[in-house]
Amino acid sequence: MLADGHDVSCVDEDPESHARLEVGLESSWEDEGGQFTVGTGLEIDALTTAGIERADVFVASTNGDNTNIVIAQIAQRRFRVETVIARILDPYRAEWYATQGLQTICPTRTAIEMLETSVREIAAGREEGS
């Protein structure tokens, strides 16, 4: 996203996670225009330092569905971010929150769909070869 000219800011409680952001970059995250803030998405100060008040898009992508839901609601309701996306691993929860107006991405559902497609393609290939 940085390469496309977007301003990108990341909040993470693990300062070491900063190194993962630089994979594939020719220079440092900051030199490429990124901003990194140590903290959690539940900390208003960390979100403010990261620039949430200027954000057009906000993505909540922690390791916990409940945390992502709460952080996404903070971004929507308190900071009025126009587009908020929450990564939700539980397909049922992702679907329910989507019906409540929260934009969700469910990697579990995506993986299931990819597996189903692969199995169907393999099965179709076997039927053709019979």
Give the residues covered by each predicted segment.
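Cytosolic regulatory regions of ion transport systems
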Residues: 1-130
